[in-house]
Amino acid sequence: MNYPSNPNPSSTDFTEFFKFDDFDDTFEKIMEEIGREDHSSSPTLSWSSSEKLVAAEITSPLQTSLATSPMSFEIGDKDEIKKRKRHKEDPIIHVFKTKSSIDEKVALDDGYKWRKYGKKPITGSPFPRHYHKCSSPDCNVKKKIERDTNNPDYILTTYEGRHNHPSPSVVYCDSDDFDLNSLNNWSFQTANTYSFSHSAPY
DNA sequence: CGGTTTTGACCCGCGC
DNA sequence: GCGCGGGTCAAAACCG
C-alpha cells in the first residue's frame, strides 16, 4: 500500500522523552524541543493551527492501532488527562491528524472494529463530530472523529482508553508463545514524522 | 437474522 | 439553580 508523504516532515525524535508516568516533564521537554513557549494556552505539539495536542500526523491509519493497543502510553490534552485520572478513568488520550486527501474511510479503518453511536454538531465548526466505541466485548475504547476547523484539509481522530485485546487485524508478533503481558518494549515509526517508543511495566 | 448506522431525545458537568 | 454544549442512549431503519 502506498501512502502519500507527510507535507510537513520533521526529523525530531522524541523517543527518549516518552516515558510512562512522567507526562508533565515529557510535555515540557517536547514544548522546549519544538520551540513553543506559550503552550499552556494552546497545547499543540506539532501543529499550531489546532487547539489539540496532536500526537503525530499519520499517513497510515494502522499506526493508531499501536497507540491504542494494550501497551500504549499517555499523550494528549494535559487538563483532560488530569481530569480523567481524578475520575479514575483510563487517562490515555491520543489525537492523530490525517490529511483528508487520504480517503476518509481508509482513515477510519485502523484495524479495530468500531460501532458508531453518535454525531453532534460542534459550536464554531461547520463540521460534525462522530462518536465511536470499540465493538469488542468489555472494551471501552472510544474514538472521536472531526475535521480540523482551522485546517479543513485535516481530520482529527481522538482515541480514549486502551484496548483490552489486540487488534483483530494487526499482527504484533509472529511468535507462537506471544504474550501481550510480557511485551514490555515496543516502538513504531510514523512515516516521515516522529518516532515513539515505550518501555514500561505493562 | 445479527450487527451497524441513524437520529432525536436524554443526560450531565461546568460556568455563570 | 439554570442553561448550554458536549456526550450517550436506544429504537428504528438499514444492510449483508
UniProtKB/Swiss-Prot annotation:
GO cellular component: nucleus
Protein name per UniProt: Probable WRKY transcription factor 59
Record-linked PANTHER family: WRKY TRANSCRIPTION FACTOR 59-RELATED (PTHR31221:SF273), WRKY TRANSCRIPTION FACTOR PROTEIN 1-RELATED (PTHR31221)
Gene that encodes the chain: WRKY59
Residue range(s) of DNA binding per entry: 103-168
Localisation per UniProt entry: Nucleus
Known role: Transcription factor. Interacts specifically with the W box (5'-(T)TGAC[CT]-3'), a frequently occurring elicitor-responsive cis-acting element.
GO molecular function: DNA-binding transcription factor activity; sequence-specific DNA binding
Keywords recorded for this protein, A-Z: DNA-binding, Nucleus, Transcription, Transcription regulation
Family label: Belongs to the WRKY group II-c family.
